[in-house]
Amino acid sequence: MMAAGPRTSLLLAFALLCLPWTQVVGAFPAMSLSSLFANAVLWAQHLHQLAADTFKEFERTYIPEGQRYSIQNTQVAFCFSETIPAPTGKNEAQQKSDLELLRISLLLIQSWLGPLQFLSRVFTNSLVFGTSDRVYEKLKDLEEGILALMRELEDGTPRAGQILKQTYDKFDTNMRSDDALLKNYGLLSCFRKDLHKTETYLRVMKCRRFGEASCAF
């Protein structure tokens, strides 16, 4: 039985994901640059929180506590996104231009669209896992938001950038297999890490451009 605190957090994350983001996306052309950044940061934050909560619930449910540290130091936990030149934290992100950070964010988002599209078929008996279709929709919306920012910064004529041809594997539906559990555990860990990177990059860009007092994070 989950504690009240984590379940409340998960319910809140799910409620936030149900907000009418598509209305915002449809209004992108008429929005100011500051509003575009504000909305992109907000939804990256929501998705990162849900990714973290999903990872934690999976870990509590399927991975014995004594095995967690050793598993995360194996090839299972390796994220192929680590092979692209993506900053690993705020300080490194500040050395990149806004367009560079947007392109990297787009690569990270697009690498998950395939694996997440059918995630709900894997986790059918959980409140959080069952929201994966919603996560896919919101990830698509965030992709559109990032593309809108790129159009604004490139004066409406986006240039061709790096193409990430490799994507993550699909989640394994055979939850009775130890190999499948380890694979899914590694994928959820990578999803959490990649969403954290995306949120960090967007927050760095927003704070750098608009110098808000709340930029500390």
UniProtKB/Swiss-Prot annotation:
Key words, A-Z: Disulfide bond, Hormone, Metal-binding, Phosphoprotein, Secreted, Signal, Zinc
Location in the cell reads: Secreted
- InterPro entries, from UniProt? 4_helix_cytokine-like_core (IPR009079), Somatotropin (IPR034975), Somatotropin/Prolactin (IPR001400), Somatotropin_CS (IPR018116)
| Cystines in this chain | C79-C190, C207-C215
Q: Which domain of life is it from?
A: Eukaryota
Which sites bind Zn(2+)?
Answer: H46, E199
In the record, Phosphoserine modifications are located at S132
CDD domains on file:
somatotropin_like
UniProt key word Signal: yes
One GO MF term attached to the UniProt entry: growth hormone receptor binding
For this protein, the parts annotated as crossing the membrane are: none
- Which is a GO BP term held by this UniProt record? positive regulation of growth
The signal sequence is: 1-26
The UniProt family comment states:
Belongs to the somatotropin/prolactin family.
Job of this protein: Plays an important role in growth control. Its major role in stimulating body growth is to stimulate the liver and other tissues to secrete IGF1. It stimulates both the differentiation and proliferation of myoblasts. It also stimulates amino acid uptake and protein synthesis in muscle and other tissues.
What is the official name of this protein in its record? Answer: Somatotropin
- According to its UniProt entry, this protein's organism is Bubalus bubalis
Write the lineage as a comma-separated list.
Eukaryota, Metazoa, Chordata, Craniata, Vertebrata
